[in-house]
């Protein structure tokens, strides 16, 4: 993987770049649709390519490991061969999912023992077998296995957790370097900066991660209950230290406003389930604010969902989409999910354009309040 830093904004830390992988290029800033089990909920890959303009998607190691399982994925030639997506893929290590299984997992130095949410069977994730699993899945970008402490952890717990994450990172790097890709194309490993909301720990973590010299670096453990002000502060603290010549990935974030604020602070890559999850619940993101398509106000509105949006937005009226949601038609959730994902991709593409034009901060400031309105 190669990262070419192109333009850095003169008024902020926003920047543009190009990530080159063996499955294609990714223009940053970029939003990555979440395809947890190898698919993006409600959206066919052809729609992801043509309507959403997705350049890279996510898969989740925990879910893919449990179902369909590594035997199936390996026999198919990796996740690309299994699901037919021919562009880059990033896999989360599954750490967040495993540590979300409160009451059905046990944490120790070796790794994390857990029970499947599907059938209750026992499993263990270690840094070594997670690297092996991600090799079998075959994503272009693999995430290191880390502990994801609760958002409101106290300093002592957060420090202890970070120390374990750093030891696990060393084991991940060692295993990654000892193994080879299985399918003839390059894979990259991204370490993850943890440290909860403690600047001291975030600085320590960022320095530790930066010293690994990885192809890219991630910021984890944010948007888990802390205020947006604290989240932005942690991003600033970390990005002062992470190398500028490597892509920076903010995991699991967030709203359109969060994304623009993080771009201003030097983040390049984003993922979040919000576009599809909110879409399935009739909430549409637009530059004018958020629309609840179940509201009666749209019943007689025959204007397009978004006249400046993707093809589906332009041919679908608000009244028709309102009707589909009221009738509980599956098509409603599909259209809304496509719209939201396309909007997120449009947002980061527009951000890229304004960084290139040199007016990113003015543009961001002119739209950010409206993005948060309910209409």
Can you describe what each PLM-predicted range is?
Residues 1-182, 296-298:
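Non-catalytic, usually N-terminal nucleic-acid engagement modules in DNA/RNA processing proteins
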Residues 1-20, 26-33, 41-42, 146-152, ...:
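C-terminal extensions of enzymes
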Residues 24, 57, 92, 134, ...:
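Conserved, mostly hydrophobic/aromatic
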Residues 65, 150-151, 225-226, 278-279, ...:
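Short secondary-structure capping/turn micro-motifs that flank functional sites
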Residues 129, 133-136, 160, 164-171, ...:
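A non-catalytic, amphipathic alpha-helix used as a structural packing/dimerization or gating element
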Residues 139, 170, 174-177, 240-243, ...:
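Generic secondary-structure signature for well-ordered alpha-helical cores
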Residues 152-155, 159, 216-222, 330-333:
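Glycine- and acidic
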Residues 163-166, 175, 179, 184-305:
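Glycine-rich phosphate/ribose-binding loops and adjacent secondary-structure elements
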């Amino acid at each position: 993987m190669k990262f070419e830093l192109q333009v850095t904004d003169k008024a902020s830390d926003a920047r543009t770049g190009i990530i080159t992988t063996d499955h294609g290029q990714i223009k940053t800033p970029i939003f990555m649709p979440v395809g947890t089990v190898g698919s993006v909920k409600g959206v066919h890959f052809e729609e992801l390519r043509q309507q959403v303009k997705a350049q890279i998607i996510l898969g989740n190691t925990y879910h893919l490991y449990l179902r369909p399982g590594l035997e199936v994925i390996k026999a198919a030639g990796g996740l690309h061969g299994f699901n037919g997506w021919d562009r880059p893929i990033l896999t989360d290590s599954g750490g967040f999912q495993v540590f979300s299984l409160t009451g059905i997992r046990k944490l120790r130095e070796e790794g994390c023992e857990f029970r499947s949410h599907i059938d209750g069977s026992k499993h263990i994730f270690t840094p070594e077998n997670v690297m092996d699993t991600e090799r079998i899945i075959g994503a272009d970008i693999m995430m290191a296995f880390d502990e994801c402490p609760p958002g409101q952890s106290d300093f002592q717990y957060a420090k202890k957790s970070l120390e374990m994450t750093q030891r696990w990172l060393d084991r991940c790097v060692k295993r990654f370097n000892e193994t080879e890709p299985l399918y003839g194309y390059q894979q990259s490993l991204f370490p993850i900066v943890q440290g909860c909301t403690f600047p001291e720990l975030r600085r320590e973590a960022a320095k530790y991660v930066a010293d690994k010299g990885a192809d890219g670096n991630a910021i984890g453990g944010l948007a888990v209950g802390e205020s947006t002000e604290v989240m932005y502060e942690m991003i600033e603290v970390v990005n002062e230290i992470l190398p500028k010549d490597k892509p920076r990935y903010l995991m699991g974030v967030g709203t359109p406003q969060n994304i623009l604020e993080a771009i201003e602070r030097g983040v390049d890559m984003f993922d979040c389930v919000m576009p599809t999850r909110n879409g399935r619940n009739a909430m549409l993101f637009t530059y004018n604010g958020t629309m609840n398509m179940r509201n009666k106000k749209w019943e007689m509105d025959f204007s397009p969902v978004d006249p400046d949006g993707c093809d589906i937005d332009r041919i679908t009226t608000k009244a028709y989409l309102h009707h589909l949601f009221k009738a509980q038609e599956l098509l409603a959730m599909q259209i809304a999910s496509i719209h939201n994902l396309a909007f997120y991709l449009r947002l980061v593409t527009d951000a890229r354009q304004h960084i290139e034009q040199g007016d990113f901060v003015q543009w961001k400031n002119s739209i950010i309040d409206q993005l948060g309105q309910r209409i």
